[in-house]
Amino acid sequence: MELKLLNENGQEGAVVNASDVVFGRDYNEALIHQVVIAYQANARQGNRAQKDREQVKHTTKKPWRQKGTGRARAGMSSSPLWRGGGRIFPNSPEENFSHKVNKKMHRAGLCSIFSQLAREGRLSVVEDIILEAPKTKLLADKFKTMGLDSVLIITDTVDENLYLASRNLPHVAIVEPRYADPLSLIYFKKVLVTKAAVAQIEELLS
């Protein structure tokens, strides 16, 4: 598979030969969907909570007598039928949202995403991205020259200047190959991969 190599002006020049095993896979929508859903589910904190009728702080006094009033019988104001009462099936922090995806499936899903990005022209290779100083303006000007506004940068090692300069830019993220997740790969409009990172990705996913 040939990947486009961009220069500092965002123009396509030479090409980089990449592994077909990683960047030449067929598009598998069902597998990608499963991998993304599992990633989102496993990222949930699971801290939502509601109260049932036992946990709601209400008096247990019977609101009115059982018979003779003409009203519906009622036992206590914490009943789920009442406003301010407890929930019948409340959400609990103990709920388990985790989804298990085998390593082989996870790798295949990432390969399918990388391959589709390459086919759509959303994945490009750069020699390296180096900044002389940790200045956001320097990086913003570089992206403007290259015509980028939403970009995920995958680099073999995260340069400190590059990391500090990118923190205040919206829709920009920098990760190492081992931390590239399926959701970010799909979310960003453009994915830039350094030459050294391409080799690392092939080693991780082959």
Swiss-Prot record:
GO terms for cellular component: ribonucleoprotein complex; ribosome
Residues covered by region (Disordered): 46-78
A Pfam family recorded for this sequence: Ribosomal_L4
GO terms classed as biological process: translation
Biased composition annotated in UniProt, kind: Basic residues: 58-70
Record keyword Ribonucleoprotein present: yes
Keyword Ribosomal protein on entry: yes
This protein's UniProt keywords: Ribonucleoprotein, Ribosomal protein, RNA-binding, rRNA-binding
Gene Ontology MF terms: rRNA binding; structural constituent of ribosome
SUPFAM superfamilies to which the protein is assigned, alphabetical: Ribosomal protein L4
InterPro entries: Ribosomal_uL4, Ribosomal_uL4-like, Ribosomal_uL4_dom_sf
Protein family according to the UniProt entry: Belongs to the universal ribosomal protein uL4 family.
Function comment: One of the primary rRNA binding proteins, this protein initially binds near the 5'-end of the 23S rRNA. It is important during the early stages of 50S assembly. It makes multiple contacts with different domains of the 23S rRNA in the assembled 50S subunit and ribosome.
Subunit and partners: Part of the 50S ribosomal subunit.
Protein name as catalogued: Large ribosomal subunit protein uL4
Organism the protein comes from: Burkholderia cenocepacia (strain ATCC BAA-245 / DSM 16553 / LMG 16656 / NCTC 13227 / J2315 / CF5610)
Gene (name only): rplD
